[in-house]
């Protein structure tokens, strides 16, 4: 019913669109738009050191540090590209623009706000990966209903075999509606709705968990499963953001969001204790329907005062969320030994699932913040918050378990211009963040742990080499409780973890023809474990990469207007494959390259793009603390065409 309504609205908007004129999807270019190398998403393009799932070795998404147009958003599922134009990861000096930052960094989703021009964009891509053909088709349109007052946008998307790392075959659909209403000069409202459906149509690939040995050599295509081994989810995001200019210079910003991730009855396969030859114990779990649902939002009042060359801004802020989850209740069955690449054909057995457990989290945070800017001298900020956090967990047959916390949270930051082009910055942040849930091989699988206090200190320099090229060099330290699987396979707190590191960014236009986005992070993720009778053991955490370098280059030869050559080099250092730090994976360097050509055909901007990824077909793995390993994606190619009518 919801999908039909979105389709009907989309077709109506498309039908009333006259001839068009302005580029939208054809002009998307993450390298050209990135301000630094710490993470930028534009449309389907993503570059930089960090992402919504990894910043300084932690996950901002898991921690709960997401924003939509700058306002707090508690994610059950991410808004899709029908309503989301992109995202920016803010750490270091770029995070100082937020009145209430977070220790793990902030990820700010930017909505695809419809404007005052008629535009219909079409994007189609075709990819090749071993025996797979990967398909993607997207249509987006925007229509001004009342010019300068109301514009509406809508989009539809279809993809096939784009989640090949997780499914033997998969398909997905996306739809979205968004509006931009500005009834007068003082009020703006942007409501939106996005829907995504993704499912495995050829079997969910088993998760591979390593034994006490080196990993075997395998690719994702070696991990197969029967067709009935299904997974899927249905995701909804809707809400609005609004700005209202109030009397006496006050500004009100507000956002209210509903995020839903529904998972029907599904299966998950595991190969446990895999040895160096690729043999392990094959197990499959069936889970009853589950969900994650959250209502969240933020109200912010802002008032600025100008005093000559100094500007003072006060923020009064309230954030809240109401989050519910249903999880667990699965039945795990074992099917003996299996060798990767030689999975048996199994008929679906009878599973005995039980009612899932449920948890609710309610949190309200109020705060006050101050920011000062002294032109030519620097800026400084500070904030104080008090949060009320309540989490209730209910298991079938057990009394509910309730936990409460009401800590004070605070942060302070400053940046000083040492010269016209050189600035030094520093900050201290105390926050409360979510730490994730138990992995699939834990006895308390999918159980979320309570939010905990976390700390971050960082400092660094920003140098404006030219007006179009900047360098950032920073130091950081983040402290959190450490949760992992113990010897009884129970996911619980085992100690503390500290990430200390150096991060570098060089981004911008080197010449009129050459753009560079280069970043490096040198990370020391250390665990202080106190689980063995009080004895303290210090180890290196598994998962975070000790040295990561990513360099994106884009060259636009002056001789061919509209042509751009792209290249990306990524270097990952050697890293531990097990929590005992007894085995290491070798470092790896991968190379991506591509070409894009943009021109206007009959007044229609059109972009052609050819990409090749992992061109040298490097074989390696990404490990995590639960002993799961995931192979690098194999060499693959993709051709795409985007046009704005």
Segments (PLM) and residue ranges:
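Flexible loop and strand-edge segments within Gram-negative outer membrane beta-barrel domains
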Residues: 186-188, 192-236, 263-265, 271, ...
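Face-selective signature of the C-terminal outer-membrane beta-barrel domain
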Residues: 188, 234-262, 281-396, 417
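Surface-exposed extracellular loop regions of Gram-negative outer-membrane beta-barrel proteins
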Residues: 199-212, 322-331, 390, 414-458, ...
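Gram-negative outer-membrane beta-barrel transporters
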Residues: 376-379, 477-479, 493-578
